[in-house]
Amino acid sequence: MTSNRKNENEIINALSIPTVSNPSTQMNLSPDARIEDSLCVAEVNNIDPFVSASTVQTGINIAGRILGVLGVPFAGQLASFYSFLVGELWPSGRDPWEIFLEHVEQLIRQQVTENTRNTAIARLEGLGRGYRSYQQALETWLDNRNDARSRSIILERYVALELDITTAIPLFRIRNEEVPLLMVYAQAANLHLLLLRDASLFGSEWGMASSDVNQYYQEQIRYTEEYSNHCVQWYNTGLNNLRGTNAESWLRYNQFRRDLTLGVLDLVALFPSYDTRTYPINTSAQLTREIYTDPIGRTNAPSGFASTNWFNNNAPSFSAIEAAIFRPPHLLDFPEQLTIYSASSRWSSTQHMNYWVGHRLNFRPIGGTLNTSTQGLTNNTSINPVTLQFTSRDVYRTESNAGTNILFTTPVNGVPWARFNFINPQNIYERGATTYSQPYQGVGIQLFDSETELPPETTERPNYESYSHRLSHIGLIIGNTLRAPVYSWTHRSADRTNTIGPNRITQIPLVKALNLHSGVTVVGGPGFTGGDILRRTNTGTFGDIRLNINVPLSQRYRVRIRYASTTDLQFFTRINGTTVNIGNFSRTMNRGDNLEYRSFRTAGFSTPFNFLNAQSTFTLGAQSFSNQEVYIDRVEFVPAEVTFEAEYDLERAQKAVNALFTSTNPRRLKTDVTDYHIDQVSNMVACLSDEFCLDEKRELFEKVKYAKRLSDERNLLQDPNFTFISGQLSFASIDGQSNFPSINELSEHGWWGSANVTIQEGNDVFKENYVTLPGTFNECYPNYLYQKIGESELKAYTRYQLRGYIEDSQDLEIYLIRYNAKHETLDVPGTDSLWPLSVESPIGRCGEPNRCAPHFEWNPDLDCSCRDGERCAHHSHHFTLDIDVGCTDLHENLGVWVVFKIKTQEGYARLGNLEFIEEKPLIGEALSRVKRAEKKWRDKREKLQLETKRVYTEAKEAVDALFVDSQYDQLQADTNIGMIHAADKLVHRIREAYLSELPVIPGVNAEIFEELEGHIITAMSLYDARNVVKNGDFNNGLTCWNVKGHVDVQQSHHRSDLVIPEWEAEVSQAVRVCPGRGYILRVTAYKEGYGEGCVTIHEIENNTDELKFKNCEEEEVYPTDTGTCNDYTAHQGTAACNSRNAGYEDAYEVDTTASVNYKPTYEEETYTDVRRDNHCEYDRGYVNYPPVPAGYVTKELEYFPETDTVWIEIGETEGKFIVDSVELLLMEE
């Protein structure tokens, strides 16, 4: 800093300094007399500390250097910047991080815990080592970008450092210690965002995947908002906590406001400009906020004279000082002339002071009219006023003496001398100083040098070149015996010419306008804008900006606006009164919301323009709204030739949208454009930048919506967006009457599926709902989804196409069924395979998927490589399947069934965007082929009808014979379980009741099958109702039975059998009966080995009967008429046997002489009955009961109980006794 002083001395040339009579009080005003780290503080009543210049200077230096490397800097600039940054934050001397922390602690008088301090400092030390290592690797790589080893090292160190700082940031925002840690947090957050920017600058050169670069970019955007909100929130909290009532509290309040603006808010204002996609070239940003140096009043009074310090000298209250000093929000202006008025305080000839008691300041916005403000006493001309000229001059440094005089016992505080050092930024040779100087001989003096509080950005150059702030205004604290000027300052980056330079994006805050139009107000900035902002609530213009165009007038520009709005609106721009842009802009916030970081958006006009004059006036206005709130932060002038990623995205989206439609008719959708592809184009449009192309985005959205409507109209599937999946119908009503006529109607109204098929909301792959089909543990019970396309939707002799998108699948079977079954089995690798469609990316703030992540482009030529019936190893997630339709018949309503099925445990599928569309009319060979197939199908249908008629007649006769009459509500008295099973077997000979591909789908004979099957179910229900033995078929093991000894229930031939292996074992059950009624005890059993198996029925006293089974006996038969059964015994011969009472084996014999080789397809293969070959029986309701194996014997007896309880006991004498069923049936009255 000494060298700076020498340069300045050469300019000032021994300015006169007022003399004092007492050498002991004479103030050394030599240029080297600076206070480096703090102003002198009083020995008593001290305020600790007023300033730490090294803390402030670090913040100023970093912000100043960042302003020079915004956008995309040159490689050399960036390497130099990182070297500077590491040197500033991790120098060889005292740790700046500790100084940051201590400085805020002293300002707010709150210390962090020792653990917090030690943890933070240690972690920052580690970050310093990581940054130094990264910086060195970066410089090495920049020297030779083609060196593979350097590239590998820099990438490795980048990833490690970024992760390290990401995890370190939370250590700098410990709960209840956020304010003292705030300056540390802001600097660390700044480092992180700068580091994340490097991924966008260099990531692809380092070998990062585009998805990784994008992920780092998304993190940068997200953390920019997070860090900004944190800094603003806790800055405001800390500032409000310091709000007090007296002058001393205001002094501390103002120091916090100034120092944390420099060390925190200035950085936050620059964060958005790190976005290289929005700012892809060098960018100039400007800080227009104002800060205030300390009042020029004595603060270093010696012990015993504390009242001579200005804040103790009957100073005004906190609120009075704030009202006098803090300027209301205003347009940025520059001082042009200062007139200072003086008064005299005289005690004696040796103790007197002329001092600053008031002033008039003339100031002007850029290109605007002159304004004047006055403060203090300005009508006293007994002492000649001093006028100082500042027009076109930056006052970069002030030096002021705070004097004190004692009048009787009352101290008087005032300023007898002040020097204003200036330079003309347009002419660096015009520099010097202008001085206010009055006679003074008082009791003490204190020098205030503005560079102590606002030091230059660097000591490498003279301060007239490296100054960071310029004087913008002067306030005055007024008390009875107190006058203390307060200087306000703006940052040097806010130039006074609004110059648009070449090859850069120029940001100009709108508070740099020359005027405000009616209805516009300047409001305080929210903390992250770097200054105040403009607001209006109705249609009109905001203001005019006088621009200085420092580029050829042929250069074309686009304009962007950073704004917040509670409504959709139109912005318009004018150059010299001529409208050049009008565009629609969207709402960014809700009315009544606080202004937050996310409230602001940067959006622009796509139409470029050029300036016609080197000095031009730019006007911004808004229209098409009323009674809403619109805020403007800044406008940006972007060279038109700059290619943004957003511009490339727009061009790509426009091509994609146009490619949806045919070249001959822009309102007609291409046939090969899938519904999934339209959704992806919609995502592409949604990801376009609102800031860059809002109007074009809206226009493209309308086109994509129209394409989506066309896609929906041509799609013959109902509910393609999967709003609902119906469960499987029960095709027989409770009373056994078929309700099949509604099946076709219901099947043609949306999707039907198994219970495990679920609808999922859209993800990063699907924009709309999709379905998942899981695996199954039993191939007889697959998970499925199906829908029928009704005949009325189809055209004769036309080819149709089923297509969709599969995220991933294994063993997914797809069928199209009409005359034949077109079939594919698809295995599609998922997103974590060799064919990823998207990358893992952060979700949005509301949990929405990130559909803007990079993914492979849609390629309609990639398709399934397999043919019908083959297992398909899909390399594309798109699938297609064709089917040809011949003649249509609305009465027959054959339609087309669309089926998806998983029948393996390992299988699964996620699919969506399903379409069934008309592909083309059939001609030539295809037409001939479908006609031939249709004829074969009809021939087979006729044969099936003949067979069905015969089988149906036989089955219906057998079913009718089970019941008393056609009401089907009462069984014949002699109907037994074997007869019911025999009838059911005949019913199941009706073929084509269900489709073999998915036997839950009704076939051509479903109606008659369900009719008869309903009667079978009724018969079983009636039969079960009259059998009073519980669990007589042992299907529930030994439930309801009493057991003595060792017995077991074993599965044999798909039946449950009771096995009694020992003669001492016994099984019994007490059964409630109706005394006086007749019952039939019927037992089906098998005896192995010697001895007898016995089933006994008895009451408590006597009335016992039994059935005996031997190994060597033949199966018993029974008389037809149970009304004459009183005369027969269990051992009667077979003469009385009737065919209705035939055993299971005879009843289940099948006549196959009239079988027809019918298959519901027109394939050339020999037909086989799929149901007979399929071990999975998909029978609705009652499942086919397996016949009793050979060797079992059925016997029965009549029994008339005399009490209400009988006992049935089962045992044997030796060998093994196997019992299939025990029935006790109530006789009909």
Curated annotation (Swiss-Prot):
Molecular function in Gene Ontology: signaling receptor binding; toxin activity
Function: Promotes colloidosmotic lysis by binding to the midgut epithelial cells of many lepidopteran larvae.
Organismal lineage: Bacteria, Bacillati, Bacillota, Bacilli, Bacillales
Family: Belongs to the delta endotoxin family.
Designated gene of the protein: cry1Bb
Tagged with keyword 4Fe-4S: no
Record keyword Iron present: no
Protein's recorded name: Pesticidal crystal protein Cry1Bb
Listed SUPFAM superfamilies: delta-Endotoxin (insectocide), middle domain (SSF51096), delta-Endotoxin (insectocide), N-terminal domain (SSF56849), Galactose-binding domain-like (SSF49785)
